[in-house]
Amino acid sequence: MTAEENAKNIAENEARILELEAVVLGNKSRAFDHRSLIEENRMMLLSNYTAAFAGNRQLANMNTYAIFSNRIAFLRTLSPENDVQTNFVNSQINKARLDALVHRAALNSKVIEISARMAEINAQLIDVNRAIMQANEEIVAFNGAQLAANSAMIAGEHSMAEATVSANAVVISTNAEIIADLGSTASENSAKLEEHLTKTLENRESISQNKAEISERRTKIIANRAIIASNRAKIARG
């Protein structure tokens, strides 16, 4: 191996490095764009959750209470003329109370089930946070090692005066191997980013559809509330 051959190989490596920089740094930009989309989706999901649970759910539950309150109030306005009619009124009141309790118990089961799923999701988010922390630690460790390398170089270790053709050839060959591995990693990352971006955009569409459905349901809930109020007024008038 000669100095001229080393120079040729260095030039080839440099050309590949320039290509890899474009891909790797492009992937970095796309990865952070993708992360931004994911964060936006998460905020939209939380907004939908609040609108559905704290908003629509509570309004619908208020309607349920008012519906059964109206039914029981109406039954109590009746004037039974005999024991059979009295039993009818009382049994219907009990039935209304039971219908409400059965409905509430079923909802409680769903709340418990959904809460369990949310707890699992939180556990996954904790794992994600740990992964981010670990990646940060790796960056800090890498920076520490590179700072040590800079300090050693500044202190005169691995000086240019000690360079040899064979030692340079080893570094050049190692660089070529790293370039090959890095090219594979960059290509895999590009493919993964494309796949994940597609899924993220699909999620965005689903979230938007859910938002529209939540809005439509609230309109129905409010319409039901008007009917409930009308029924209440009729019962009050007798």
Language model region names:
Residues M1-G238:
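Extended amphipathic alpha-helical heptad-repeat regions
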